A protein has these predicted regions:
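N-terminal export leaders
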Residues: 3-7
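Bacterial Sec-dependent signal peptides at the C-terminal "C-region" and cleavage site
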Residues: 10-25
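N-terminal catalytic or cofactor-binding beta/alpha core of small enzyme domains
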Residues: 23-272
Length: 273
């Protein structure tokens, strides 16, 4: 109890700039939806809209590539996040929290620290609205449930039939493994183990290290359970086959199946919500 009070107080001190009030302030280019489960869905790279008056980022002097300077959108992840929220509600009777960037990544990148996320100050409000919502929702989940799961949804083309896990090799799910042991991170009843059972091809399948390009970025590193937010956070990199329009609903159904089972095992025990 003392640790939880300390974490809450510290989160206000460290993340007060993200506005930890009851409701995120609305922004036309950030879709937010309050949930009734200890589950948060994030999709920072699926948007296709311009930020008015903002030029495309150039990335001068920045290294390019996965985890570095990128302007391509993760096609289909906006639609996947919304479909997944619907599928979770259908299975569990309640909706998860949802934060989706509708602005295109070439104007601002919500999965980078602010100093690397945008070049035009006029893009800052959209970026901050995204993180305000995530910070507030993490705080709400921590307050109401004491534990939670943040799934940060991305797309990749390195392996079109695979979903890559990104937790900084377990760092962003520190509390999960402390509570339930390493099998909760890499065993058959881990989230990715449950994804595999649901019919998805995943990597890593066991205790192997995560693929170097997809180990988890700014969002999971900012809100993961190794931080004051105390929410287990997993970056999910979906191959193209999972994100094409005709497959999004099927993908959402499979992922929702894994989410429901994971929640029963690790999130909702002895809870009255």
């Amino acid at each position: 109890m003392k640790r939880m009070k300390f974490l809450k107080a510290l989160s206000v001190v460290l993340f007060g700039s993200y506005g930890l009030g009851a409701e995120p302030a609305p922004h036309p280019l950030v879709l937010v939806s309050e949930g009734k489960l200890p589950i948060i869905l994030s999709a920072p790279h699926g948007g296709d809209q311009a930020i008015p008056g903002v030029a495309e980022r150039k990335g001068d002097a920045l290294e390019r590539g996965p985890g570095k300077f990128v302007t391509a959108r993760d096609t289909g992840t906006e639609e996947l996040a919304i479909a997944l929220a619907d599928a979770i509600e259908k299975r569990m009777g309640k909706r998860p929290y949802l934060v989706v960037a509708k602005f295109h990544r070439k104007y601002a990148d919500a999965n980078r620290p602010a100093e690397l996320a945008f070049e035009d100050p006029k893009a800052k409000p959209a970026y901050e609205a995204y993180h305000t919502a995530l910070a507030q929702y993490c705080r709400a989940v921590q307050k109401n449930y004491g534990r939670g799961l943040l799934l940060d949804l991305h797309g990749q083309v390195a392996a079109t039939d695979t979903i890559f896990r990104g937790t900084q090799n377990g760092k962003t799910v520190t509390l999960l493994t402390q509570r339930f042991g390493p099998a909760a991170q890499n065993g058959p009843k881990s989230f990715f183990g449950l994804l595999e059972t649901a019919g998805c091809k995943v990597y890593p399948r066991d205790e192997s290290r995560e693929k170097s390009s997809f180990t988890g970025g700014h969002i999971v590193m900012t809100y993961g359970s190794h931080t004051v937010h105390a929410i287990d956070a997993i970056q999910c990199e979906f191959g193209t086959e999972y994100r094409v329009r005709e497959k999004v609903k099927d993908t959402a159904t499979k992922v929702a199946t894994a989410v429901e089972e994971f929640a029963k095992l690790y999130l909702l025990e002895d809870k009255k919500h």
